A protein has these predicted regions:
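Primarily the internal scaffold of c-type cytochrome electron-transfer domains
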Residues: 1-162
Length: 163
């Protein structure tokens, strides 16, 4: 309703690495000096690789969940979420072409490509993606994801605080 009738945007062009490494670095709990005197340092390349993959998976997961729960078929929100899901699925396919992530690949193999406004989305797909990325993150420290480096943006959202 907020998008379809209220004119609000259905989302932003969010990319986890650039947003989490800009003016607000999200490393305080794990940074040098934590918990008493944490530093505001950028994430390591290994951590940025994991953030990059996580951001894409969460974008697809959220978009699929939104499509599954849409109230107005063919409305602005529905169309925007289908476009967003297709963009995220395309990015994820690119990622999966250069890294091994079998659990994630298994879930994405059951997602229609491309997704249309009339596509049936497996109601278990969003949770399947969430579970798969959780398992993946528990088994990877990012060192095995070097192939993602050319895909990861070096730009940030805002300038980091220098303190």
């Amino acid at each position: 309703q907020v998008v379809n009738r209220g004119g609000h945007l259905p989302g932003s062009d969010f990319e986890l690495v650039s947003w989490s490494q800009g003016e607000v670095l999200h490393n305080f709990s794990s940074s040098e000096g934590a918990p008493n005197a944490p530093t505001n340092r950028p994430a390591s390349i290994e951590k940025r690789r994991l953030l990059f993959l996580t951001g894409i998976v969460v974008d697809l997961e959220t978009s699929l969940r939104n499509i599954s729960n849409v109230k107005e078929q063919g409305g602005k929100f529905h169309i925007a979420m289908v476009a967003r899901a297709n963009a995220a699925a395309k990015k994820l396919d690119s990622v999966l072409s250069v890294i091994a992530a079998p659990g994630i690949a298994d879930v994405t193999s059951n997602i229609p490509k491309p997704i249309g406004t009339d596509s049936a989305i497996d109601p278990n797909a969003p949770k399947g993606l969430a579970d798969a990325i959780t398992v993946f993150l528990g088994s990877s420290d990012g060192t095995n994801l070097k192939a993602l480096d050319p895909m990861i943006s070096n730009s940030t959202k805002g300038q980091p605080y220098g303190g």
